[in-house]
């Protein structure tokens, strides 16, 4: 029986959260449901846009507060790990850690995991597919540099199409 309690913070693109949850269940697939982790999910759809906060400074503190509130909820429920599904949300983590330093021990940093995996696979250069805010602020370039990974951004005129793909990928996939 799997006993770990995992917190998932979603709501930053509902379909990305749905896709992550589906993949998590597939990863733990077994003959018994008792082998799945105890999962607590918080989808705060009312949180302001992370992309607009990064690009225009709109509601930046509200985004930090919203992420912090979700993390606090997870910690109150005694989760052992917290996963933020949204890559762009990782940009705000330093500000979140100033408010909740103990969260750093529980957050599964998906960008660091990506860096470690890419380094193991000896990948020296990757194309970053992410929301405009993460691309403009060079979130992945900055974070993956320590792993020796060079990040290439798509052309700026493709950013809107990429955002649509990120937000609607599950819906689009069902059409084909």
Give the label of every model feature segment:
Residues 1-176:
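Non-catalytic structural scaffold of enzyme domains
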């Amino acid at each position: 029986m799997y006993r770990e309690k995992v917190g998932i913070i979603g709501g930053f693109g509902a379909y990305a959260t749905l896709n992550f949850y589906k993949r998590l269940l597939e990863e733990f697939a077994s003959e018994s449901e008792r082998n799945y982790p105890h999962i607590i999910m918080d989808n705060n759809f009312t949180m302001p846009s992370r992309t607009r906060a990064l690009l225009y400074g709109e509601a930046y503190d509200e985004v930090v507060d919203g992420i912090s509130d979700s993390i606090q909820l997870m910690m109150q429920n005694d989760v052992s790990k917290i996963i933020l599904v949204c890559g762009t949300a990782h940009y705000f983590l330093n500000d979140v850690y100033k408010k909740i330093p103990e969260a750093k021990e529980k957050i599964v940093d998906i960008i660091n995991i990506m860096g470690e995996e890419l380094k193991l696979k000896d990948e020296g250069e990757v194309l970053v597919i992410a929301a405009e805010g993460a691309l403009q602020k060079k979130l992945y370039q900055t974070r993956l540099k320590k792993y020796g990974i060079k990040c290439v951004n798509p052309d700026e005129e493709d950013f809107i199409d990429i955002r649509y793909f990120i937000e609607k990928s599950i819906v689009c996939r069902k059409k084909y």
